[in-house]
């Protein structure tokens, strides 16, 4: 797979320079505005889950099965079956997921947009989506592109004799690219110069080893042909997808049981990718001028490899060939490094010429599965036990294609597996009667006399709910996992204070559940959120505004055995600007981390502004530090923090001992009035954030400030309440 050192950033002479061109380090506040209703052609009231329920699922699958062997002249099917290329399409649609921030994946159909639609690793997948268009057009909005891409991969596997683990719908489309994902800083396709350090240590914020690849270079690190060195790259990227060694082997071998790679001629024959193609190409890219440009003359990755003798049928032949032969390095017609079986007969069928056969071939990264000691043990076991291999691939494929969907409660359709899987972050179903309005009033009274401060009530609820990530729908208040490992021990959650608050809340919960009649119970998850509501109401009352924070019961409490400690460790904030916390492992400026966190919480610029200034007014800062608490009346929910931040009578200067902390001094006397962090001062320095901060700091904004704070607060508290949508 050659990079050809192509720069994806051409500099058009007449292109207007953007603000980002002038100021490359400008804070990307715009990521909070992506996927607004203005870009949605279906309107605000469209409910995909309801539309999906109207889908004739059986008929759709039947149409997909027919498509598999309905070869089209403009893009003929290899081996007379489109299944392998649809498996690749589904794999590449979902395989961009990474655990560190939950971004990537197939949950929104992003493969349709740049940069993914034009990545070198996705070469000619545009043809697969065009083959699907007649079916998408037929079924309309009852099936999203995001769901269709994955379902088609499943049907492809089934049509080739494989039994899948199941399928769940529920992936709603968006209509523009995700701009919040960090794919890397390289300026050439397949570049690696910005993402590695030391002994080839991959940047902790990235998953793929090369710019424009889903995973790793199939020719080995930087095209070296070194199958032993490839093991480190493979583990680095697959581990960041939450896959273990067995899942890695199963996925690679399972995927390479089907189809072929295409390298009939040098890659110089390929035309521009979809985003760079001329307008008359109508979004199709990589048009080749070699021979017919398709079929036997296809040029995709540059590799020319067919792994098995039954490339359109499930078998164990990948492992049979891997272990049967010794391998020697060779080059494809395109010049890519690959491996051919020594002293082998021509047993591999040609994809388009009937009666023609080839020697078995493998990728460099395929040989890694045999010769790496740990991968080798697993591969040998799968070779000797085909049923174990099939089971492992089915489960790993389901995980790959569903990992970013969140809890099972979001799953739709008749093929949802009944088995509960630990990576789905399971929560027990509510099997008791929920509290009513009178119960909520009584519980609020108990909370008011509990001895817990407003800061403790609000801070604990925030700590619980703000773990939510809109990217992969993980975290949130439901489950009350803040009382379980690892969350209970996170430094940002102040373990000692948290233990004290939880003990008090558990006492209130126990008293209520023991005395309530009619089978009523309250979960700790609900009580934590209700406690936060009480704190907010008290803070608003202190500001002279009476408000009732909306509360919806229905959460339940997860168990420790339902909580994968290692998996949840990825949710621990290194920096949390909402609580003015900067951890020891923080690697980005606090204001950048704040915007990133706000985006994961699905907050708009106004919601972010009113939330953080209100939380500063209440002071839920970790350790009770006063940074950013720019008010003489902490605990009162008013706009005084913003008033003081925007006060020109204060001059801000950095503190020499801490690059994140600043002193606000009186311009006349030089006296220190306040301290603040970068996460505070950004609301005065960034022109967009300042414009919104000014609205909330105005004299007529008293009630609006509280009202908008409550709305944003409830949004975060209910972020994982998919049952309320």
UniProtKB/Swiss-Prot annotation:
CDD domains attached to this UniProt entry: catalase_peroxidase_1, catalase_peroxidase_2
EC number(s) reported in the record: 1.11.1.21
Gene3D superfamilies xrefs: 1.10.520.10, Peroxidase, domain 2
Protein's organism: Janthinobacterium sp. (strain Marseille) (Minibacterium massiliensis)
Pfam families: peroxidase
Keyword Nucleus: no
Positions annotated as active site in the UniProt record: 92 (proton acceptor)
Record note on cofactor: Binds 1 heme b (iron(II)-protoporphyrin IX) group per dimer.
Residues the entry annotates as binding heme b: 256
Location of cross-link Tryptophyl-tyrosyl-methioninium (Tyr-Met) (with W-91): 215-241
Record-annotated site: Transition state stabilizer: 88
Listed cofactors: heme b
The protein, known as: Catalase-peroxidase
């Amino acid at each position: 797979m050659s990079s050809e050192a192509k720069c994806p950033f051409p500099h058009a002479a007449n292109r207007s320079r953007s603000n980002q061109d002038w100021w490359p380090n400008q804070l990307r506040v715009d990521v909070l505005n992506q996927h607004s209703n203005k870009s949605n052609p279906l309107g605000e009231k469209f409910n995909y889950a309801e539309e999906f329920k109207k889908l004739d699922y059986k008929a759709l699958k039947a149409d997909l099965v027919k498509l598999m062997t309905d070869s089209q002249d403009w893009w003929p099917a290899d081996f007379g079956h489109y299944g392998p290329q649809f498996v690749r399409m589904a794999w590449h649609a979902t395989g961009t997921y990474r655990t560190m921030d939950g971004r990537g994946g197939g949950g929104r159909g992003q493969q349709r947009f740049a940069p993914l639609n034009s990545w070198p690793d996705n070469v000619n997948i545009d043809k697969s989506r065009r083959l699907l268009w007649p079916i998408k057009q037929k079924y309309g909005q009852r099936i999203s592109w995001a769901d269709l891409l994955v379902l088609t991969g499943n049907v492809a596997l089934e049509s080739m004799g494989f039994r899948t683990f199941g399928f769940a719908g529920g992936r709603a489309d968006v209509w523009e690219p995700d701009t919040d994902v960090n794919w890397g800083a390289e300026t050439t396709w397949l570049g690696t110069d910005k993402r590695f350090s030391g002994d080839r240590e991959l940047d902790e914020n990235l998953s793929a080893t090369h710019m424009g690849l889903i995973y790793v270079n199939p020719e080995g690190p930087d095209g070296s042909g070194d199958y032993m060195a490839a093991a480190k790259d493979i583990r680095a990227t697959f581990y960041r997808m939450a896959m273990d060694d067995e899942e890695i082997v199963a996925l690679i071998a399972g995927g390479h049981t089907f189809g072929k790679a295409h390298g009939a001629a040098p890659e110089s024959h390929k035309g521009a990718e979809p985003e760079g193609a001329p307008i008359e190409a109508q979004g199709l890219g990589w048009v080749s001028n070699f021979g017919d440009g398709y079929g036997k003359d296809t040029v995709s990755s540059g590799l020319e490899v067919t792994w098995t003798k039954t490339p359109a049928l499930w078998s164990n032949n990948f492992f049979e060939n891997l272990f049967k032969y010794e391998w020697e390095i060779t080059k494809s017609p395109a010049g890519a490094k690959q491996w051919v079986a020594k002293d082998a007969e021509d047993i591999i069928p040609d994809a388009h010429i009937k009666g023609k056969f080839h020697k078995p071939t493998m990728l460099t990264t395929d040989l890694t599965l045999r010769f790496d000691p740990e991968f080798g043990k697993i591969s040998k076991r799968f070779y000797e036990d085909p049923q174990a291999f099939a089971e492992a691939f089915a489960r790993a494929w389901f995980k790959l294609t569903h990992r970013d969907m969140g809890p099972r409660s979001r799953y739709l359709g008749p093929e949802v597996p009944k088995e509960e899987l630990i990576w789905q972050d399971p929560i027990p179903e509510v099997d008791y009667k929920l509290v009513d309005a009178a119960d909520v009033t009584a519980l609020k009274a108990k909370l008011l006399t509990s001895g817990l401060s407003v800061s403790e009530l609000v801070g604990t609820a925030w700590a619980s709910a703000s773990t939510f990530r809109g990217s992969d729908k993980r975290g949130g208040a439901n489950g009350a996992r803040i009382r379980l490992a690892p969350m209970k021990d996170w430094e940002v959650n102040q373990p000692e204070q948290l233990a004290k608050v939880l003990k008090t809340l558990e006492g209130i919960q126990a008293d209520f559940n023991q005395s309530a009649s009619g089978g009523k119970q309250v979960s700790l998850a609900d009580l934590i959120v209700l406690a936060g509501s009480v704190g907010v109401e008290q803070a608003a009352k202190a500001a002279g505004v009476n408000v009732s924070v909306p509360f919806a019961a229905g959460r339940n409490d997860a168990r420790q055995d339902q909580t994968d400690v290692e998996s949840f460790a990825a949710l621990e904030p290194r920096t949390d600007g909402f609580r003015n916390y900067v951890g020891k492992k923080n690697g980005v400026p606090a204001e950048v981390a704040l915007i990133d966190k706000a985006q994961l919480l699905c907050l708009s610029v106004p919601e972010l502004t009113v939330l953080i200034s209100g939380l500063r007014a209440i002071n839920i800062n970790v350790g009770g530090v006063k940074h950013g608490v720019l008010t003489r009346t902490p605990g009162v929910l008013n706009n005084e923090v913003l008033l003081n931040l925007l006060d020109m009578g204060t001059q801000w200067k950095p503190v020499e001992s801490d690059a994140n902390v600043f002193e606000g001094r009186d311009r006349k006397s030089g006296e220190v009035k306040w301290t603040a962090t970068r996460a505070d001062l950004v609301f005065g320095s960034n022109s967009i954030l300042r414009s919104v901060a000014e609205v909330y700091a105005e004299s007529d904004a008293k009630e609006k400030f509280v009202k908008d704070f409550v709305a944003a607060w409830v949004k975060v508290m209910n972020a994982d309440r998919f049952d309320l949508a």
